[in-house]
């Protein structure tokens, strides 16, 4: 040590030299240096600047460093004491990538070596070093030399001796990290360095991490106002650190050489000595920013405390090699509130640095050298942390305390980490807990009851060839989640999510540049096994218990131990259990398990191929994923009330969480470049994750009383998360059932269980939601509505919540797609079922922000199928056997849903080609806005407005299926019932009528009159005179009111007194209700529009129950009649001839005894005693097939609608019963089998065009009065009625076509052409039905009906009328609904306009029994009506109790009017009278026309000409018509005669006539009819050679009718030749072993006969001789010539055929017989041809005189030319 007499200047320079050797300080100014050398030497330095060149921190660059005061105290006893204060260091990230080389490393060994060199006075070494370290100005500097700072033994001993007596104390340390968008600050109160016995001890006290920029939220408990005043002056002096110029000179430099180059200019212009060149450069820079520093000082942001460390102790051994390092940290406190914003700004700066670093890496890649491998010495032996406390809400003060104590804090206590050796390390956390101090509840903790001394978390790290990390949680974990914690987590999630995404993007951006450094291909896969060691991570936890605390209940989640293995990429747990706990139940409080997830496993090893489906076409595609989660089974069983409670609580919780989530931080994201789509890029999509649930069961119990449980069974559920954020989910199998005791009702199931190739449900979630349904069968149960209505629902809360949610929600769109979907409709009381099959359909649901929703949907190919009893539905196995019968060779046939349902027993009854359904759901707020902006024309606004449009509707019905369909549709919902008291209020509250009467008012007058009573008494002898005229003598007679009702109008009551004269009657009182609307909002409006409706009515019956019932009734009648006949025969044989003669004389007076039965109120089966039972089968078969002519009459048996009364018993002269129903005419067939199935061809066709139906529901409330008030309304003058609903039906045009084979007429009902063309937009039928409540407070409702009909043209054939009567009167008790309300509907008012009718009527039989019974209407059947005209007058009726009474009143009012006033118009249509009337009108024209012309202009000659012309036209036309009738009558007689003699009769005129054509029938029950390959199949358009004929085919509905009408009849039963027989094939279904088993499958042995015979019999139709009329005389002559030639050819063929057969016979007798058979044809056929030629010629002449006659004939008669075409 230097002596005391050494000069002060020399001492300063000596100390300066020593300090410079420490490589710590830059140039030291001597004025700031105080030295006092001696035994107790002291050195004081002020305002020291650190040498930034000597400091090199990996990844960091020191921009500046300074020390305010530094004191060195050197004593002999205490050694060296260094005390620093006010240390300020500013750092910035370095752009130099990779690890620093050895020359840039700063260590304690380097500084110690410099100190040792200074002690040994090796000046030459320092000079050489300065020369070597002088940077070159060259742009390409050489790499610096690597210097080893290993000391010699002497130097090491000297350094160790020096450090052993060194004590370093640093106070007020401030380290500032400057980033591009963030400034962070670390403040340390005190740092102490001691050395004892070779061990270094470093102690850091009071370390704080502050965030300066940007301004962040500090947390709760402090005022977040700028606290810049609290900052000291030294902070403001550092404002120059943020200047942009300095950022450009140092921060943006790549390395230190660039920094030296940037400072060359300042070196050249330095004014100071060479020792302060660097200071002069920096001083110039700082001086330039001095003015700005003063302005920036006022806007300096306040520092927000982020973290605080109370104490940190570091202990290590060694000097050059640090060993046995032990780090002990005290209590660490962290405020979590500012962390998200700080991380966001830091990561944003780091991302920019990474981008610049990656660019500079390419330039310096060639200068990199391989670093030596690090040794395996352990640097850190022990790390201990007393506690880490994180507050998620409170702010952190500068003194290290939280501003608030009652906040949510995470505490990690006693953290230890030890490194045993270089390959093994372990650590633990003793206690982990999340608590809230206000409630003293632990939200996150581990169970210490079993092992209190075991740490909560354990960690092991093993570094050998494989780096293995093992994380163990040996204790069970308890987590309590409440609303506060959930909202807090949601807030931090919303803040941290963009930060994490940005961090991931920063890490991922380094990967492409690392590829470029190695000069490899961008798409090459790198061998990671050779470059780095593989890492493994294993985790094992104990059970986890999560308690979700809601309002008044909680949900507990128990998770079984979780294991994770990174090598296999497997994360699994055995079970996850959810329990529901409700403490409000009191003693019944118990945990209920409601959800169980079994065997959850997540795999992330390798790439898995996942089967999926395209979101638009549902085509199969394959995707790839690295993460796949599989759940073996998930079971949910929950009470429905609890489910509603949970959903409500979660809804409120979701709203709370949504409100707590803040807007994401403005993190600048890197702009993504979208590449165009290509086939290569879209070849295989990559998924983020795939979740598969193999089986899921959901059960909701106790939904409502008597409902049972609702069970969901889902199989093979897949949820795919795509990279673009899209979520795809699909379910392969879905089954939803209602289970109540033994009842299992399916709500949703697979329509075809065999079709498993496509998912039943597919959903796509992105911006919009898309849902696809395929092969699904939905079922609607009417009973469910009744059961679910019994459940009470809080309406007000739901409305409020829905309105609140709709106000905050955004626009959403849900797209639905349907393919091969069926909807089953099950009624409430009936056993029938309707299936609606939808082939394709789409529906778009748009949910708006204003509460308005809109549904737009379209469906194609809708088929409605019906079955009478669900018990008759065949199982899949049974129906599958029938399918094999149809197509036995194809085992992979694809069956449509229509075919499958038909094979199960359903009958198609309706078909719609396309259907459009649009619905609008309006909110009250939106409707009020529309009402204010509405036009004057619109007065009604519906909350739900539905419009349905269909292009074409086809309906095919039989009598039984028609009733079944109507009753089933009516029974789809239980009608609303009201009690009698709710309807009419028969009881009222008692009223004290004398309550306000003063009893003393008339007391005085009474007393006065008492005195004079004697004067007013009547004498006893005076007789009382009674005025007889006082009472109305006509009270018992018909009053004027009754006659007014009959005439359709009302009149006065006719009372003589004038007391009621002041009452004013309003005739339109009942018409006011609802006719003039004010602007109002109604609940619902439904509009249905159908362009074309076709209704086909078939004969026969669809249901097997109906057929069986009729067959059994026939057998019973047959047996009874046979017994009676046997008894009569016995009586006849035992009687004498006289007795028999007396009985025969009385036979004309007594009817033969008959056996009768009435079926379905429309079928009357009757058989005379002793009659041949064969007639039953003949008549029934003939009735359905109608193969006979119109003249056939059955005299002794019938199958008729009517009753079994004695009046309906048929005699030998009667063909009808006494009832209004008609018999079914029966013919003769050889077989006794009955064919009752649906006929192939329809009998009646109803065509409707432009059908519009609108239904307005005005009131949605249902009054249930509870008070029996006296008056209904306070204001009696006010109308208290209420319009409940209005139904408006309009039909543009309708026509009923007659297709009965025995009827030659074409149209049954249509528009009357003579009335003129219809107006555009007018409707043939318009009906308005209003449902009103006369008293709005009562539930009783009435109807107001208004009907208008345009003029009608009727062509009524009696056979068609019988069919329609029998069809309409059919009633099966199975489809009769229970009479819940026996009261009939009351019709308040009925109004119908006058209807003009022109009628043609053709009777065919007369019911004489009905005439004898008094039914005078039966006399109409004696006359044929032709163009009879009548008018049904306008009627207005009031107060009608039911529709039956309405029908009777209409008949009683219209018929007398027609008989009284319009009898002439009716009689003018009689065939004998019509010609006379026409000729009379001609004579009238002959006289009237000249008179009219004379009166007009006085010209007589022109008048006579016009009159004569009119007379000739009318008279000539009638004479020609008379000639046509005469010729036609003659032809009819001749054809009947020919047919009776063995000819073909009128059948020759039928199109497609073939001589001697017979129907093919089975001769035995075991015979199967064959189809040759040349014939067309009955099952479809495709030819099926060898298919067994079966009418009930299973192909798509709608195709059968097209080919059946043109199908050829089956020819030849036993006359098939050998060649044709060889071409046929015999096919037996695969399920049958022999043909003998075929009858067992069918329900009766006559089923096959039902199918074959009808095709032949129904093809034979009667053709009128007036049809196909020629247009003019020329065409008439051509037609006459053709018909004459045809008949002559027929006669010639008969002669040739007879000659041929006679020549082959070889005997004269046979030849004579053959010629005798052909003689009638040879004689009669030429005469028939002549009469037909005359008739056709005359028809041509008639059509020339009156062209309208041709159109009338085409309208009236069937046109065989069109049918043949």
Curated annotation (Swiss-Prot):
Annotated stretches, region: Disordered: 218-243, 1188-1224, 1746-1765
Catalytically driven reaction(s): a 1,2-diacyl-sn-glycero-3-phosphocholine(in) = a 1,2-diacyl-sn-glycero-3-phosphocholine(out); a 1,2-diacyl-sn-glycero-3-phospho-L-serine(in) = a 1,2-diacyl-sn-glycero-3-phospho-L-serine(out); a 1,2-diacyl-sn-glycero-3-phosphoethanolamine(in) = a 1,2-diacyl-sn-glycero-3-phosphoethanolamine(out)
Acidic residues bias spans: 226-243
Name of this protein: Autophagy-related protein 2
GO cellular component terms, A-Z: endoplasmic reticulum membrane; phagophore; phagophore assembly site membrane
Keyword Transport (UniProt): yes
Bias type Basic and acidic residues, positions: 1747-1765
């Amino acid at each position: 040590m230097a002596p005391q007499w050494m000069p002060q200047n020399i001492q300063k320079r000596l100390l300066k030299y020593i300090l410079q050797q420490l490589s710590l300080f830059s140039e030291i100014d001597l004025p700031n240096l105080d030295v006092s050398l001696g035994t107790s030497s002291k050195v004081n330095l002020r305002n020291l600047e650190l040498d930034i060149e000597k400091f090199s921190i990996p990844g960091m660059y020191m921009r500046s460093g300074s020390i305010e005061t530094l004191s060195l105290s050197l004593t002999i006893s205490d050694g060296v004491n260094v005390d620093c204060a006010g240390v300020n260091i500013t750092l910035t990230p370095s752009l130099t990538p990779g690890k620093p080389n050895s020359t840039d490393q700063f260590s304690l060994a380097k500084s110690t070596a410099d100190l040792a060199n200074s002690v040994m006075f090796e000046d030459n070494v320092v000079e050489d070093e300065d020369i070597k370290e002088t940077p070159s100005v060259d742009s390409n500097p050489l790499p610096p030399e690597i210097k080893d700072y290993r000391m010699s033994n002497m130097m090491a001993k000297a350094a160790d001796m020096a450090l052993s007596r060194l004590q370093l104390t640093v106070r007020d340390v401030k380290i500032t990290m400057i980033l591009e968008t963030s400034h962070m600050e670390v403040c340390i109160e005190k740092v102490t360095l001691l050395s004892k016995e070779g061990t270094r001890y470093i102690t850091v006290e009071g370390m704080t991490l502050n965030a300066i920029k940007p301004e962040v939220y500090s947390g709760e408990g402090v005022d977040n106002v700028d606290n810049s005043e609290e900052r000291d002056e030294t902070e403001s002096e550092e404002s120059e650190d943020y200047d942009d110029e300095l950022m450009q000179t140092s921060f943006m430099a790549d390395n230190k050489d660039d920094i030296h180059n940037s400072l060359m200019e300042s070196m050249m212009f330095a004014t100071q000595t060479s020792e302060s060149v660097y200071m002069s450069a920096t001083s110039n820079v700082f001086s330039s920013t001095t003015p700005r520093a003063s302005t920036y000082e006022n806007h300096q942001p306040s520092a927000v405390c982020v973290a605080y460390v109370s104490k940190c102790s570091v202990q290590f051994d060694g000097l050059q090699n640090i060993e046995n390092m032990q780090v002990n940290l005290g209590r660490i406190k962290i405020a979590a509130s500012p962390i998200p914003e700080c991380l966001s700004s830091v990561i944003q700066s780091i991302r920019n640095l990474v981008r610049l670093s990656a660019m500079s890496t390419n330039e310096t890649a060639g200068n990199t050298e391989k670093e030596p491998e690090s040794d395996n010495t352990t640097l850190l032996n022990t790390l201990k942390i007393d506690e880490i406390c994180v507050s998620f809400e409170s702010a952190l003060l500068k003194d290290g305390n939280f501003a608030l104590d009652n906040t949510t804090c995470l505490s990690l206590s006693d953290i230890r980490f030890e490194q045993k050796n270089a390959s093994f390390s372990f650590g633990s956390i003793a206690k982990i807990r999340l608590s809230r101090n206000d409630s003293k509840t632990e939200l996150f903790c581990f169970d210490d009851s079993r092992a209190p001394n075991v740490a909560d978390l354990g960690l092991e790290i093993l570094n050998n060839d494989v780096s293995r990390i093992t994380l163990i949680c040996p204790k069970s974990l308890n987590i309590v989640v409440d609303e506060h914690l959930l909202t807090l987590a949601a807030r931090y999630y919303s803040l941290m999510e963009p930060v994490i995404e940005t961090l991931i993007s920063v890490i991922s951006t380094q990967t492409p540049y690392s590829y470029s450094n190695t000069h490899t291909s961008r798409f090459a896969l790198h061998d990671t096994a050779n470059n780095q060691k593989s890492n493994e991570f294993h985790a094992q936890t104990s059970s986890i218990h999560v308690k979700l605390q809601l309002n008044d209940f909680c949900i507990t989640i128990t998770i079984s131990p979780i294991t994770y293995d990174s090598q296999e990429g497997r994360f699994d747990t055995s079970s996850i259990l959810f329990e529901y706990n409700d403490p409000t139940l009191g003693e019944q409080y118990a945990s209920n398990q409601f959800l169980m997830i079994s065997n959850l496993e997540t795999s992330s090893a390798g790439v898995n191929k996942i089967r999926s489906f395209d979101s638009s076409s549902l085509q199969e595609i394959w995707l790839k994923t690295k993460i796949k989660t599989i759940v073996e089974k998930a079971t949910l069983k929950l009470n429905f009330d609890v489910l509603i409670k949970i959903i409500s609580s979660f809804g409120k919780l979701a709203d709370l969480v949504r409100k707590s989530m803040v807007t994401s931080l403005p993190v600048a994201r890197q702009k993504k470049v979208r590449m165009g789509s290509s086939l290569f890029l879209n070849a295989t999509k990559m998924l983020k994750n795939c979740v598969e649930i193999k089986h899921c069961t959901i059960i909701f119990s106790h939904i409502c009383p008597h409902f049972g449980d609702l069970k969901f069974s889902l199989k093979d559920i897949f949820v795919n998360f795509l990279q673009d954020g899209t979520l795809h989910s699909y379910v392969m199998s879905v089954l939803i059932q209602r289970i109540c005791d033994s009842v299992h009702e399916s709500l949703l199931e697979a329509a075809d269980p065999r079709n498993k190739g496509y998912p039943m449900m597919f959903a796509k979630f992105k911006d919009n939601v898309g849902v696809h349904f395929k092969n699904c069968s939905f079922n609607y149960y009417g009973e469910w509505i009744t059961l679910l209505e019994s459940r009470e629902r809080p309406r007000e809360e739901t409305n409020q919540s829905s309105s609140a949610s709709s106000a905050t929600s955004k626009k959403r769109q849900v797209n639905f797609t349907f393919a091969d979907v069926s909807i089953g409709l099950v009624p409430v009381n009936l056993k029938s079922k309707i299936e609606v099959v939808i082939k394709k359909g789409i529906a778009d649901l748009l949910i708006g922000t204003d509460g308005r929703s809109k549904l737009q949907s379209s469906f194609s190919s809708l088929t409605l199928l019906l079955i009478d009893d669900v018990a008759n539905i065949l199982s899949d196995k049974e129906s599958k056997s029938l399918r094999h019968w149809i197509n036995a060779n194809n085992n992979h046939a694809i069956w449509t849903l229509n075919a499958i349902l038909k094979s199960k027993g359903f009958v198609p009854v309706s078909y719609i080609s396309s259907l459009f359904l649009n619905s609008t759901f309006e909110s009250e707020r939106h409707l009020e806005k529309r009402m204010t902006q509405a036009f004057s024309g619109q007065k009604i606004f519906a909350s739900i407005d539905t419009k349905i449009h269909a292009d074409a509707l086809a309906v095919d019905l039989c009598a039984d299926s028609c009733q079944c369909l109507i009753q089933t549709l009516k029974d789809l919902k239980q009608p609303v019932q009201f009690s009698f008291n709710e309807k009419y209020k028969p009881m009222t509250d008692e009223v004290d009528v004398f309550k306000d009467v003063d009893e003393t008012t008339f007391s005085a007058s009474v007393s006065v009159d008492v005195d004079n009573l004697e004067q007013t008494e009547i004498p006893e002898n005076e007789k009382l005179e009674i005025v007889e005229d006082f009472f109305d003598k006509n009270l018992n007679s018909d009053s004027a009111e009754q006659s007014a009702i009959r005439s359709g109008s009302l009149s006065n009551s006719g009372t003589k007194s004038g007391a009621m004269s002041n009452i004013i009657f309003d005739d339109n009182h009942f018409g006011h209700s609802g006719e003039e609307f004010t602007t109002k909002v109604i609940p619902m409006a439904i509009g249905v529009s159908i362009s074309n409706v076709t209704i086909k009515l078939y004969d026969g019956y669809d249901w097997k129950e109906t057929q069986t019932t009729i067959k059994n009734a026939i057998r019973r009648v047959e047996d009874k009649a046979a017994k009676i006949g046997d008894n009569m025969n016995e009586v006849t044989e035992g009687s004498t001839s006289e007795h028999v003669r007396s009985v025969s004389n009385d036979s004309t007076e007594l009817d033969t005894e008959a056996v009768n039965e009435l079926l379905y109120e429309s079928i009357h089966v009757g058989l005379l005693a002793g009659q041949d039972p064969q007639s039953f089968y003949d008549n029934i078969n003939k009735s359905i097939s109608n193969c006979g002519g119109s003249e056939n009459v059955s005299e002794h048996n019938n199958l008729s609608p009517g009753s079994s009364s004695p009046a309906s018993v048929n005699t030998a002269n009667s063909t009808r019963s006494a009832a209004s129903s008609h018999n079914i005419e029966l013919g003769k067939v050889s077989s006794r089998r009955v064919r009752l199935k649906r006929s192939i061809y329809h009998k009646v066709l109803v065509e409707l065009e432009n059908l519009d139906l609108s239904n307005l529901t005005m009131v949605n409330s249902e009054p249930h009065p509870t008070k029996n008030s006296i008056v209904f309304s306070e204001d009696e003058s006010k109308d208290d009625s209420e319009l409940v609903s209005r139904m408006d039906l309009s039909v543009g045009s309708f026509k009923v076509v007659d297709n009965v084979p025995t009827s030659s007429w074409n149209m049954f009902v249509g528009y009357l052409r003579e009335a003129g063309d219809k107006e555009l937009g007018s409707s043939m039928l318009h009906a308005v039905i209003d449902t009103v409540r006369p008293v709005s407070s009562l539930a009783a409702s009435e109807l107001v009906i208004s009907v208008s009909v345009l003029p009608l043209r009727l062509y009524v054939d009696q056979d068609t009328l019988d069919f329609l009567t029998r069809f309409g009167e059919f009633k099966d008790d199975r489809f009769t609904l229970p009479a819940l309300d026996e009261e009939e509907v009351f019709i308040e008012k009925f109004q119908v306009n006058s209807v003009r009718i022109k009628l043609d009527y053709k009777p065919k039989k007369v019911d004489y029994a009905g005439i004898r019974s008094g039914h005078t209407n039966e006399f109409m059947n004696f006359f044929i009506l032709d163009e009879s005209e009548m008018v049904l007058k306008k009627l207005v009726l009031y107060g009608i109790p039911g529709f039956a009474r309405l029908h009777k009143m209409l008949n009683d009012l219209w018929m007398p009017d027609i008989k009284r006033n319009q009898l002439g118009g009716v009689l003018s249509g009689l065939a004998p009278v019509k010609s006379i009337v026409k000729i009379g009108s001609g004579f009238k024209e002959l006289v009237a026309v000249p008179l009219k012309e004379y009166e007009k202009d006085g010209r007589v000659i022109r008048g006579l000409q016009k009159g004569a012309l009119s007379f000739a036209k009318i008279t000539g036309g009638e004479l020609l018509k008379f000639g046509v009738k005469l010729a036609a009558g003659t032809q009819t007689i001749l054809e009947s005669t020919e047919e009776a003699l063995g000819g073909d009769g009128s059948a020759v005129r039928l199109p497609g006539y073939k001589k001697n054509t017979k129907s093919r029938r089975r001769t035995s029950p075991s015979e199967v009819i064959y189809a040759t390959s040349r014939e067309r199949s009955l099952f479809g358009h495709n030819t099926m050679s060898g298919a067994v004929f079966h009418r009930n085919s299973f192909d798509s509905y709608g195709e059968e009718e097209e080919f059946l009408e043109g199908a050829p009849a089956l020819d030849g039963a036993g006359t098939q030749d050998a060649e044709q027989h060889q071409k046929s094939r015999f096919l037996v279904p695969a399920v049958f072993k022999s043909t003998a088993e075929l009858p067992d499958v069918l329900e009766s042995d006559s089923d096959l006969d039902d199918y074959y015979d009808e095709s032949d019999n129904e093809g034979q139709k009667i053709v009128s001789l007036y049809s196909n009329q020629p247009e003019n005389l020329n065409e008439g002559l051509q037609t006459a010539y053709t018909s004459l030639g045809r008949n002559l050819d027929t006669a010639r063929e008969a002669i040739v055929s007879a000659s041929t057969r006679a020549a082959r016979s070889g005997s004269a007798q046979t030849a004579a017989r053959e010629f005798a058979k052909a003689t009638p044809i040879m004689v009669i056929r030429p005469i028939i041809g002549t009469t037909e030629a005359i008739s056709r010629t005359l028809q041509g002449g008639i059509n020339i005189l009156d062209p309208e006659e041709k159109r009338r004939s085409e309208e009236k008669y069937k046109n065989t030319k069109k049918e043949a075409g």
